Each structure stands twice: as structure tokens, then as C-alpha cells.
Amino acid sequence: MLMMSMSRDDKLPRSVPKGTLPRIWRFAAAHHRMLYGFLALTTVSAVIAVGVPVLAGRVVDAIVNRTGLSTVIWIAAAIAGLAVADALLGLAERWMSSRIGEGLIYDLRRAVFGHVQAMPVAFFTRTRTGSLVSRLNNDVIGAQRAFTSTLSGLVTNVIQLVLTVAVMITLAWQITLLALVLLPIFILPARRMGRTIAALQRESANLNAAMTGQMTERFSAGGATLVKLFGRPQAEAEEFGDRADRVRAIGVRTAMANRVFMTSLTLVSALAQAMVYGVGGWLAFTGRIEAGTVVSLALLLTRLYGPLTQLANARVDVMSALVSFERVFEVLDLKPSLTERPDATPLPATPLGVRLRDVHFTYPDASTISLASLEEVATLEHTENHEVLHGVDLEVAPGQMLALVGPSGAGKSTIASLVPRLYDVDSGAVEVGRDGAWTDIRDTSFADLRGAIGVVTQDGHLFHDTIAGNLRYAKPEATDAELVTALRRARLGALLADLPDGLRTVVGERGYRLSGGERQRLTIARLLLAAPRVVILDEATAHLDSESEVAVQEALTEALVGRTAIVIAHRLSTIRSADTIAVVEDGRVVEQGSHDVLLARAGRYADLHHTQFAGAA
């Protein structure tokens, strides 16, 4: 029902938004010179298209009036020359339009991809991947057509139409006026049918985008597994089939609308030609015009109604292209909520500590970070977000470990996400450095900050690539020997030895060909290659069996040597050795201290410790 309501409401705009066309022209600035050349070629081509019927009429006159064979031969040669010139111009036009179109696709894709990469994590937590991919592919290609077929067609048809009418009036103004009488019968239905076809095309595009989103989610390893585990293949197939059936029905309606449209136009054009032959023949018999003029007018009439047909339907093409541009510009107009300062301060090449000073934080509202069309909802919700961190003060010195414990939803992962600046605080500050030399993370560059901080989550992400490819994501220049060393340090040496393809083994999407423990250790090996000075472990051993947990814990111990660490853990046994343990509840730090100190204090940590180990007993 939601998709149906979206399809009905998401119609083509009735008018062009102000500033869209100038913005498109500015975006194509790199292609302006080639565009001017392209327009010049189309103008010459239009002149040739009008010239051939005139020459054909002169051939008829030369034959009827018996002015000489040489005249006929010269005119025929001129027609042949124009045909060759038109063919060569057509090749040149095609080459230039392809260069412009493909260049525009390249520019748009680079711009959208780069812009999306700069968006904060909050954007990706809300956006449906398939919809975003559709913007990068389908809409970019739709925008490209505006500078190839649509633009060239408009220019060629307008020039050809003007020249054709001018030449026809010169040849026989009476017949030209009669031919133009049929224009209202021609144009009005064309505009009406054009709107119908445009609406059908847009609805089809929306349904195709929805199917792309469904396939993207269901064909991932995790999505496919979930579908099978819940016995939903049939339901998914029916949902997909329903959308595909609607696309099929729309396709049939569009094809029939196009056919009715073209049949009507062909009929009107045929009636006009019959009128030209009838009236023109009568005028020729009475000696008012030459027989060749009648032939020229009849041929020119095809040059008149052909462009009119395309121009009558041009609104559909233009509006479709503008819709594509608008959908691309929608993404480009989303402002990244996290930006770098132009005068970013470089971080010192020394061990780094982390400090949070009176940090308050609220997750951003959906309307500030996303688009309803990218989430495939009718409208974004406008709920009042509540503050999730309230005056948090924490500090971990260089080389020490800070552990965050507390119930689920207390704010531990939120604190961890603020350190690499995946979000910005509302007030207060997150700083890195050491006593006497602290730097607000908003004052340094993303590359500098994230090069100094490594993160291992409970569900480390791996790309559909080889083991080597995933590891080199952290250090592209790493040698095979360095990769092997990192794998051994992450306790994956035995696995590597057992794999026939070794480093060239493909891990599958999200690493699904590996076990949970192997995936975690591979992400740890990747972190070891990056060699960060600060390591954040967000429940890195959660959901692992005992044997895998032991192996991962050994790998983590290796990874933390000589590094500052912020560790989030539900299993208190894994953080006994932490220099500082902070208990987080309801977005506040309610206790801090070492394991022994907090137990002796008999506060919230002692309660958590007693509950966990009493339950284990």
C-alpha cells in the first residue's frame, strides 16, 4: 500500500523548478565547448534535411520541362553529396553526443559517489541501499539522456521545423497554410498523450527502484539466510512478482499508448500529404505552381510532421530528464552534518589518550540527514529526539585501557562512536592527546583522526574480496609477508595454512564463508596492519562460542599491546585488568574506578558483577 501511494503521488512535476536549468548548465560546464560544436553540427544537419526535398523537386521540374540531362545529373549528384555529408555529420554527431553523455555520466557518478561517501554514518543507517544505488545508476543515466537524445532532438527538430515552414511558404504559401490548419488536431492530443505516458514511465521507474531495493536486501548473504530461516521464500517471491506484474501491466499500457499516439500522428500526416497532393496537383494543372514544387512540398511535409511529432512528445522527454536531474541533485543537496575545518590541526606522532569533557549528545533528526524517497517511505518521521548522553566525563591516558560496562541501551556504543567522530557532540568536547596537549577532534582532519583510531565491532564488516584484499583495505601497500605476519598475530596462521588459495581465498559477502571467530580475527588482523594508536573494541567477543572467544581474546591482547584502548564488554571477566572501568546507565557515568576499587565500593559495578557471576554459577 505504501509503494502504491508513493507511485500515485510521485508524479512528474508540472513545471520546472526555478534554477534547475541554469544549474544543469553549470554542472555541464566542462562540456560546453563540445556542446557548442554539437549544436553547430545539428544545425548543418537540419539544413541538409530541408535541402534534399527542394532539390528533389528541381529534378522533377527538370524532367517535366526537359531542361537537359546534365541538369538532372548535377542535381542528382548534389543530392548524393548531401546524403554523404549528412551521413558523415551523423557519425560526428553521434561521436560528440556519446562523448558528452558518457562524460556527464562520469561526472555525475563521481560527484554523487564522493558526496555520499562524505555523508555521516547516520545517513547510511536510514537509507535503503537499493534506492541509493538506483540514484547512482538509473537516474544518472536518465540525466545523461538530457544532453544526448533529448537535447539534440530538440535543437534539430526546432531548427528543422523553422526552416521547413520557411521554405514551404516560399514555395507555395497557400498550401503551407492549409497544411498548418491541421496542427491543432495534431498537437492537442499529443500533449495529452504525452502526460499519460510520462506518468506511466514514472510509476514504472518507482516500481523498478523498489524491486532493486528488495533484491539488494534479499540477495545479500544475511538477507537470503533470514528469508530461508523464517520460511519466507514464497512470500518474498509473491511480493516481488506482484511488483513485477505491475511493471508488466504498465509496460503494456505504455506500449499501447505509444502505439495509439504514433498511429494518430501518422494518420494526420497522411491526411495532410493527401491534401498537398490534391490541392498542389490542382494548382500544378492550372499552371500556378510547378509539378516539382508539389513533390518538394509533399517531401517537406514529412520533415514538418516528423519534428512536430517529436516536439509534441518532447515534454515527456524533457520532464523525465529533469526528474532524473532533480533526483540526483536531491542527493547532492544533502549537506554532510560532519565537516572538516579548513585549517585542521595535525595530530602529533605520539601515543594518544582520549578525553570526554561534559559531553551531551542527541541523535540527529531524520529530516536533517536523509530523504523520504531514499528510505522508501511517504514522509520522514518528525519525532522529538531525546538526549542520550548527559554530561559525560571520561579520560583514558595514553597506553591505558578504559572499559565501559552497563545495561544495553545505556549509551556505551554511543560514547564509542563519538571518539572516531562518526557523530558530533551537541555540547562539550571529545579530545585526543595527553596532559597539556589535548586536541578537540573537530579541529583535526578525518584522515588524521581515523588513521589514529581503530575499531573492532561485534560484527566486523568484510568485503566480498580475497583475504589479501580485505587486509590491504587498511594498508594498500602492504606486502604478502606483512599480511601473513598480521594474520599470525591475529591467531589465523593455522587457518591460512589450511586454505588451498591462501591469501587469495575469497571470503564471500560480509565474510560469510568464514566462521564468526575467523571473521573477528580477520578484522583484528586488518586493524594490526593499520597500526592505530587508539583501539576501540565494541563487544568484539559477543556471540562467539568459548573456543572462538579464547582465540579472539588472544588476538585482541596482541592488538592492544602499547595502545590506548576503549573496551565495551558485557562479560566482566574480560575487562578485570582495565586501568579504569566506567559504569554507564541512562547516558550517564555513574561510577569509575579499577575492578578492585569498584567491587570494594559495593555500588552498581558490584551489583552487575554479582548478578553476572551468580547467574554463571
Please state what every model-predicted region is.
Residues P348-A617:
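ABC-type nucleotide-binding domain
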Residues M1-A49, V64, G68-I75, E93-S97, ...:
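Membrane-integrated ABC transporters
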Residues W25, A29-R33, V121-A122, N138-F147, ...:
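An intracellular "coupling" helix at the cytosolic face of ABC transporter transmembrane type-1 domains
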Residues W95-G114, R128, S152-T156, A179-A221, ...:
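Cytoplasmic coupling helices
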Residues I63-W74, V167-V181, A257-E326, V331-L332:
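Helix-loop-helix
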Residues G19-T20, A28-H31, F38, E93, ...:
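Juxtamembrane loop-to-helix connectors within ABC transporter transmembrane domains
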Residues A30, M34-V44, S149-E203, V276-T293, ...:
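Transmembrane helices of ABC transporter permease
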Residues A29, L35-L89, I169-Q174, A274, ...:
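Transmembrane helix-loop-helix hairpins at lipid-water interfaces of multipass membrane proteins
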